[in-house]
């Protein structure tokens, strides 16, 4: 005969307790550890710093000491292979679970990467429970779902919303749509682009003329990239704007 604890483990073998769910809903870093505990580990302190910084700007807790107002612009610079893009996809999932009217425009250096980023966000939200030992988005946010029939990889909505997500490459068309969160994810493809003044000038022009016009009043922008050049997007912003930076 099995005791009560054995029965609980059979019902809930992965150990997803109410306390863990509440923690994952409240703290983005806890959400990441629930979704992928093998990658998000306490012996990688930069991951906690990244997650807590992203959550802080989303919640308006990064305060400009000079103005007393929350920062709205965040740039984070990390080397390759540190999980920047992956963490951003989980962050968008978490934000939409917390607030399902979050509207995101994400930009990568080309449409292929932009589509992959958007698909990872969408599929993470829409994942079905196949393995009882694997935690999925709906374990944490059971009422947030992608609207069926409106789930193209690069443009989709959540149930009850008109628009939640648009992904494009640098130079793409984003007219007619505004966002509460604009994300730029590694806009530089390689070192050849990083030191090509024409490419950098085109990116800057598209950023200032097109991307910024899509950020709604009170919206935030997040730029996460590996630094290549003092003339890249982050370099120009550091010269021209007051940003909150984490490196």
Model-derived features with residue positions:
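Short, flexible loop motifs at catalytic/binding sites
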Residues: 1-82, 86-247
């Amino acid at each position: 005969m099995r005791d009560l604890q054995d029965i609980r483990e059979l019902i809930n073998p992965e150990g997803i307790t109410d306390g863990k769910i509440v923690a994952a809903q409240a703290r983005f870093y806890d959400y990441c550890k629930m979704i992928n505990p093998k990658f998000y580990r306490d012996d990688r302190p930069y991951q906690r710093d990244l997650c807590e910084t992203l959550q802080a700007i989303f919640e308006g807790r990064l305060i400009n000491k000079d103005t007393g107002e929350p920062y709205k612009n965040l740039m984070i610079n990390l080397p390759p292979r540190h999980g920047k893009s992956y963490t951003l996809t989980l962050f968008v999932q978490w934000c939409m679970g917390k607030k399902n009217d979050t509207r995101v425009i994400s930009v990568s250096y080309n449409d292929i990467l932009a589509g992959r980023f958007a698909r990872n966000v969408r599929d993470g939200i829409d994942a079905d429970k196949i393995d009882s030992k694997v935690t999925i988005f709906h374990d944490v946010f059971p009422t947030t779902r992608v609207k069926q029939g409106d789930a193209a990889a690069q443009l989709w909505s959540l149930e009850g919303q008109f628009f939640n997500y648009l992904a494009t490459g640098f130079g793409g068309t984003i007219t007619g749509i505004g966002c509460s969160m604009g994300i730029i994810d590694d806009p530089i493809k390689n070192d050849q682009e990083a030191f090509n003044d024409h490419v950098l000038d085109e990116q800057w022009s598209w950023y200032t003329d097109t991307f910024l016009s899509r950020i709604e009043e009170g919206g935030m922008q997040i730029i996460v990239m590996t630094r290549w050049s003092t003339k890249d997007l982050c370099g120009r912003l550091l010269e021209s704007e007051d940003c909150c930076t984490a490196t």
